[in-house]
Amino acid sequence: MTRSNARPVLLVIGTLAALGLLVAACGSDGDDGAASDSAGGDAAAPLVVNIAQAPATIDPAWGCGLYDIGFAQNFYVRLTQYGSKPGPEGTTQFDPGNIEPYFAESIDISEDGLVYTFKLPAGAKFPSGEPVDADAVKYSLERTIKMAGCGGYFVYDGIYEPPLIKEIEAQDPTTLVITLNQPNANFLQDLAQPAASVVDESVVAANGGIEEGKVNEYMSSNAAGSGPFLLESYEPNKRAVLRANPDFFGDPPASKEILVNFINADPTMLLQARSGQADISLGMTKQSANSLRDDPCCKVVANEDTTFWELIGTPWKKKPWDNVKVREAVTYAVPYDEIIEKVAYGWATAYYGPYAPGMAEFNEELSQPREFDIERAKQLMQESGVATPVDVTINIPEGNTIEEQIATIVQGTWREIGINLKINKLASTDYINSMEQHKAQAFTRIDGPGVVEGGYLLGYDMLCGISFNLADICIEEADKLIAEVRTETDPTKRQELFDEIARLWVEQSPRIQVYADHFVSVLSKNVKNYHYQHEMDFRTWGK
């Protein structure tokens, strides 16, 4: 089984389950969480975390979705990590524009941007007693690359011709040197991804080793980690128990024990949050979370600086979207405010541009939202020269209530400008295939980059002729700028390039950005510390 062709984006915690689109790999109907009675005010009791979807794998080198790598990352360290900044309601949140050392004590970058030298702490050990050293980091990165799953794409920043990484050298136990084939200002963020986690070679070798392009079944449900938590027990699709690693090289985590329940039944999620059985609930539908807004049981926290968005794809190779005037017209025929209020319960931000508001490259001035203006849309349709009425079929995932609501609302407004929209509900596999095989005439989608950086995003989402470019966007002038920004290391010049790409993107109206999604977490009144990161980081969570 190979995953090298998997699209390099992440499925959103708190969104996928909220949409009712549960990955088939999760198998069972979940669990009722009956074992979560230990939640409450006792600080010595386990922290109980309910998550709406179970991971398909916990191997950081193989996982693609946030449910996979977000859970898995807590058992491992990486050379770097995201910085932190203040969040809403007294919480903190990750800062994608600030990358800091994690396992590395120091980082030196050569003047030409090609050679990275990492100094590592001495004496760190895996639970097996093996050293967590430069050889372990080298082995782990090379394992991820050789397996050729999503992890390899993340570590390479999506750059394969030539491969971003030229050589990895363990000069001594505390010195690791990585040489690149070309400068890449985003490389330190690539190393902050769970895909760059440091694994115990002795455990992997004893349990299947590395096979190029293939999954390691043992690592799919076991940890071989170096991180803040040990995996004490794991029942796939049901629950997991994590205990603080007494030999962790860094600061001990805030919680000594965390009980994770995987629950895909939203009424159960809501009941356990309201009753106090769960300390932290992730993935509850916004409708349910909205019912808790004024409930003294809980604190509902919405992080606006998220990096995911709800979109309507209008593939350029399909009529009528090959006409830029038609593409522009439909962007003015979407009642954004109504959708944000009725569908997202206010937990969303309107904008129009290639970068989400939570991304460092976002420029608010260049990303002003399109207004709902039917008369302007009608005028643009007339200017397009396209005869109306036009029949368009939009694919949505079956059971996805949010995207069905969006499609239904748009169906009504587009009728006013001469577009008859047929809503086609597809089973999950058929829906994904219709996009990845570029068969869909239009589609709804929740999207966002696996690595939260503009160059990485543009490298798969906008380049002409890239199969990952699901809407077949093609702006040749922008392609040249994307190639330039991928190798530019000066922050000011990079932002200038990102801004110019945004201008070109907006001019072409390549798709509809319905809204930037806010991530909603529900915390019990006993939770004192919570940190939002698009990949769950349990280290500071506690009560």
Residue ranges of predicted features:
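Extracytoplasmic/peripheral linker and loop segments enriched in polar/acidic and small residues
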Residues: 325-328, 340, 370, 416, ...
